[in-house]
A protein has these predicted regions:
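Short, exposed beta-strand "edge-strand" segments with a Pro/Gly-rich flavor and a Y/T-containing core
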Residues: 14-15, 85-97, 186-196
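Low-complexity, polar-biased intrinsically disordered regions enriched in Pro/Ser/Thr/Gly
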Residues: 34, 63-68, 185-192
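Phosphate-handling DNA/RNA-contact segment within nucleic-acid enzymes
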Residues: 36, 42-147
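Charged, low-complexity surface patches
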Residues: 2, 108, 159
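Short linear sequence motifs
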Residues: 10, 22, 70, 80, ...
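TOPRIM metal-binding catalytic domain and adjacent DNA-binding surface shared by DnaG-type primases
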Residues: 1-53, 99-101, 214-251
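TOPRIM fold recognition
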Residues: 104-105, 116-251
Length: 251
């Protein structure tokens, strides 16, 4: 779980969150780097008991965080590359190992591993895990780790009805479930065409740190100045009763 500087997904996260937060997210979710494709990302599936089940390898565009799908879809599995004799695939949620660290926090489920990382930073009140696809990890043996938990489903656009159909099974298993369908009800045609998910919507709402990282990318010397002077990004109301924010730095 190193060589992050060569990792294309890490490079994208760096542009959004800065180095400290990007490193925290990669280590928290045990994300690695592969040389199958230069700078590709390894998403290890580690279960609630800390056992590695398998891992998915994908290649991302560092400029926009999208998966590389041309001239072919850059996605594969570690178990398919090593050809281990007698191996039986038994997947689990990406990020499932985090369930053992906090038994009280509400759990949010998304499709994409990348989206789990991004949403975890912006909405830390949830414990974010990923199913790995529209139909991934919804068998009862996968869902059993969520028994007794409060769960919110965040389907990609176009998958809301499919995920809504899973709710009755989950409730029968003792899982308290809510469906976040705001995106499905309010998305634009362009967003639907691009298959937006919660992380895509989150990234459209630029927070101060993201804006700062964009400034640093254009002028790297700004980062040196910030570190040299010990500047800290602030965001505070201009007036106690105003919702307008003033952004800047403090020493």
């Amino acid at each position: 779980m190193s060589h992050y500087k060569e990792n294309k997904l890490f490079q994208f996260l760096l542009s959004q969150f800065g180095e400290d937060e990007s490193l925290r997210l990669m280590k928290l979710y045990r994300v690695g780097t592969a040389n199958h494709w230069q700078g590709s990302t390894v998403f290890w599936q580690t279960d609630i008991q800390g056992k590695v089940r398998t891992s998915k390898i994908m290649l991302y565009n560092p400029a926009n965080g999208r998966r590389i799908k041309e001239p072919h879809n850059h996605i594969t599995w570690v178990h398919s590359l090593i050809h281990k004799d007698g191996f039986t695939l038994k997947q689990c949620f990406f990020g499932e190992h985090l369930l053992a660290k906090d038994s009280t926090k509400s759990v949010a489920i998304v499709e994409s591993e990348k989206s789990a990382l991004i949403a975890s930073s912006y909405l830390p009140q949830y414990l974010w895990i990923a199913s790995g696809g529209k139909n991934g990890c919804f068998r009862e043996e996968n869902l059993s780790v969520l028994k007794g938990r409060n769960v919110v489903l965040f389907p990609d656009l176009g998958a809301t009805d499919d995920w809504a159909a899973r709710i009755s099974t989950m409730q029968r298993m003792g899982i308290t479930v809510k469906l976040f369908d705001y995106l499905e009800k309010n998305a634009t045609p362009e967003q639907r065409k691009n298959g937006f998910d919660i992380a895509d919507f989150i990234l459209e709402v630029k927070r101060p740190q993201t804006i700062l990282q964009g400034m640093i990318a254009k002028n790297p010397s700004l980062n040196l100045l910030i570190k040299e002077l010990g500047l800290v990004l602030i965001e505070e109301p201009v007036h106690p009763v105003s919702t307008v924010k003033r952004r800047g730095f403090k020493l």
